[in-house]
């Protein structure tokens, strides 16, 4: 059952400080309406803090954007690091478990599952080098997190090409593309469109690694 693959924890703890409240507001608003359409006033209103508090923590809206990408990276990184798929003894099962977890997380409207770093970089890849770099670190860091399992799966299957690094980037390409496709759809169809893309990715891995048509073995307790 896919829901069994989701870690029993929130992506992020409830914010307590003004800074974290602003970052949480940033996650919500950037997902809903994008970075450019989100003003400092809106961020403060959503966070329930003053404008003075904003500029106490962030020198500019761009500084908030950089911090937001880093905040997203650290919180989602911890979430995926705690996921049950890591307990599979076989590397290919860990890889497929990661893809299955990604599929399980795709539900509701796009703003409930889309990537903050992906949204930020789409809007700012030429206008803000600082935000672009922070988003690169976020997206590529996510790719590197599964690279060792991919390398082991390739070795186990005696597959010499492509490389683990290339496959890890391909996963991110499919994910980010799925998020964009979902945003182009009516809300009722968006998650299903994204799941379809990830299902094709899973089938590609099954073919590449010569996986038999059977369910992944349950994770050991």
Language-model features: locations:
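N-terminal intrinsically disordered/low-complexity leader segments
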Residues: 1-17, 157, 211-221
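Amphipathic alpha-helical segments used for helix-helix packing
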Residues: 93-94, 108-133, 180
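Short, basic, alpha-helical segments at the C-terminal edge of helix-turn-helix-like DNA-binding modules
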Residues: 70-77
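Secondary-structure edge/capping motif, primarily at the C-terminal ends of alpha-helices
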Residues: 83, 87, 124, 182-185
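N-terminal positioning helix adjacent to the helix-turn-helix/winged-helix DNA-binding module
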Residues: 11, 18-25, 167
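Helix-turn-helix
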Residues: 21, 25-63, 67
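Hydrophobic alpha-helical connector segments
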Residues: 67, 81-113, 167-171
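Hydrophobic/aromatic-rich alpha-helical bundle segments in the mid-to-C-terminal region
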Residues: 112, 128-141, 154-221
């Amino acid at each position: 059952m896919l829901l069994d693959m989701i870690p029993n924890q929130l992506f992020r703890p409830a914010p307590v400080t003004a800074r974290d409240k602003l970052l949480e507001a940033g996650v919500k608003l950037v997902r809903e309406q994008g970075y450019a359409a989100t003003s400092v006033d809106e961020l403060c209103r959503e966070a329930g803090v003053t404008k003075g508090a904003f500029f106490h923590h962030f020198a500019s809206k761009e500084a908030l954007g950089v911090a937001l990408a880093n905040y997203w990276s650290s919180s989602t990184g911890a979430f995926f690091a705690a996921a049950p798929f890591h307990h599979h003894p076989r590397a290919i099962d860990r890889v497929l478990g990661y893809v299955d977890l990604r599929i399980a997380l795709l539900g509701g409207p796009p703003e409930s599952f889309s990537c903050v770093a992906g949204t930020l970089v789409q809007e700012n890849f030429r206008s803000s080098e600082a935000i672009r770099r922070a988003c690169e670190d976020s997206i590529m860091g996510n790719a590197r997190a599964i690279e060792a399992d991919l390398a082991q799966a390739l070795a186990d299957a005696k597959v010499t090409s492509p490389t683990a690094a290339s496959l890890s980037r391909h996963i991110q390409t499919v994910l980010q593309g799925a998020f964009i496709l979902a945003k182009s759809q009516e809300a009722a169809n968006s998650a299903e469109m994204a799941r379809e893309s990830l299902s094709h990715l899973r089938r590609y891995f099954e073919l590449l690694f010569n996986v038999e048509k059977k369910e992944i073995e349950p994770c050991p307790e």
